Amino acid sequence: YDGSILSPIQHHLSINHAIYVETNRDAVESVFNRLKEFYKNVYKRPNATLMYDYIDLRENCIIVKTLVTESPLMEVDGIKVPTLEKLLVDTQKDADFDYLHGSESLNMYQLAFEQYSINTQRLMRYAKRRSISKEIQELINLSK
């Protein structure tokens, strides 16, 4: 999926031209290596330090990550993409979204709940799967 899909729920717009490729744990290495054959800026499971120091999201890049089992996905034109619920949880958990933490997190949740129909049950189920249900529940409570 394209990182710019987060723009509509951001208060302080951060440019994100990254393409995120999520695949099962066993395939991450081979997907990463295959993409490196064709593209210049490909990163495998980057941590927050790598994101801040070396990855410029204003430029095109590809970030290869492990797809968490039981992730809420939907199909668009035959391609599985993350639901908004998945993105809301992942932005709080994943190091590559560290730049969205802090006050921006609350702004994102407020805008998401104002502008979209959020399936709270799906959101909380996935948050529990990612072991951050308490944090997500706090954001939900503060955003309403």
Region locations from a protein language model:
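Hydrophobic alpha-helical interaction segments
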Residues: 39-144
